[in-house]
């Protein structure tokens, strides 16, 4: 990885390209694991804790052809005893959600991330549908299963204002109030990218309000970048980082970011990238780094 970084010679990996560099980086790691005749996750980190899946079940925003403002509505099976049970719980909820949508004459077409993309415009209605599906599947929302949101606020930001709940733009302070009310009303345990990537004051403010109870997840905020994560740690913005290896370009730099996060009490969520391949490397990475999700 160090050789690749030096060969490229640019901060943003513009000469060789981050995707090309990452492909060589991950392939080298796989070859090393094979040559040592050990599992990939053991070669990377030798951890044995399986993460909880965050299952994306309703799509909105740029990922769907509907009017939902929030980009991803997810479920997290908190009480699952193992990964197989976690997947089964999510599958049962998805089945019930599909039946509910059909019963309400709503589309079961899927968005870019595989979640349903019904023609609805209310964030609250999307949440209510998920809660009903959880109940019909025989689980208790807030105990067995938590709700997680990816707002993708970069897409809802204009002139220091946000259009998170409707086409009307409101201040960051009013947007914080909206999030706080959502979290009081519903069993939401994680909010990803609630604000624009450079609106640090809003990130800090929301983290102060929700830090003890809710995951405030930085994806666009941190972009798997050590410098941006350090700024977040120092300013106490967010408490969780979404990790995408192809945002930074090498496995070594990805591991450095994960280690920095863990050393400073930040949780890590290992994630694919929109339009990613079916390669399974990130599953091994999640286990190897003891990432909880």
Provide a role label for each language-model segment.
Residues 1-2, 39-56, 88, 144-148, ...:
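Beta-strand segments within the central parallel beta-sheet cores of soluble alpha/beta enzyme folds
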Residues 1-38, 87, 115:
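Metal- or metallocofactor-binding catalytic centers and their adjacent structured scaffolds
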Residues 1-13, 46-54, 94-105, 135, ...:
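Short, hydrophobic/aliphatic alpha-helical segments
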Residues 24-32, 36, 73, 130, ...:
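Buried hydrophobic packing segments
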Residues 48-111:
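Mobile "lid/hinge" segments at catalytic clefts and subdomain interfaces of large enzymes
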Residues 54, 76-88, 119, 163-173, ...:
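Active-site mouth loops of central-metabolism enzymes
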Residues 72-83, 107-123, 152-165:
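Active-site-proximal beta-alpha loop/turn segments in soluble metabolic enzymes
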Residues 124-293:
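Catalytic core of soluble alpha/beta enzymes
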């Amino acid at each position: 990885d160090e050789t690749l970084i030096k060969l490229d010679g640019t901060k943003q990996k513009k000469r060789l390209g981050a995707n090309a560099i990452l492909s060589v980086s991950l392939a080298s790691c796989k070859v090393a694991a094979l040559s040592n005749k050990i599992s990939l996750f053991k070669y990377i980190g030798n951890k044995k804790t399986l993460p909880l899946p965050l299952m994306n079940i309703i799509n909105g925003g740029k990922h769907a052809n509907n009017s939902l403002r929030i980009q991803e509505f997810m479920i997290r099976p908190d009480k699952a005893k193992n990964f197989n049970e976690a997947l089964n719980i999510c599958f049962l909820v998805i089945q019930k959600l599909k039946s509910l949508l059909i019963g309400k004459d709503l589309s079961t077409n899927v968005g870019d991330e595989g979640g349903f993309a019904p023609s609805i415009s209310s964030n609250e209605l999307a949440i209510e549908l998920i809660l009903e599906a959880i109940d019909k599947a025989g689980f208790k929302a807030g105990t067995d299963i938590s709700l997680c949101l990816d707002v993708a606020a970069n897409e809802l930001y204009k002139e220091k204002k946000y259009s998170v709940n409707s086409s009307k733009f409101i201040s960051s302070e009013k947007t914080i109030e909206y999030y706080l009310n959502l979290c009081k009303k519903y069993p939401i345990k994680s909010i990803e990218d609630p604000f624009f990537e450079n609106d640090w004051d809003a990130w800090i403010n929301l983290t102060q309000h929700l830090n003890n109870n809710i995951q405030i997840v930085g994806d666009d905020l941190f972009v798997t970048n050590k410098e941006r994560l350090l700024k977040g740690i120092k300013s106490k913005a967010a408490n969780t980082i979404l990790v995408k290896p192809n945002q930074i370009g090498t496995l070594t730099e990805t591991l450095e970011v994960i280690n920095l996060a863990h050393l400073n009490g930040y949780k890590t969520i290992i994630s694919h990238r929109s339009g990613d391949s079916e390669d399974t490397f990130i599953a091994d990475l999640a286990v190897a780094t003891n990432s909880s999700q």
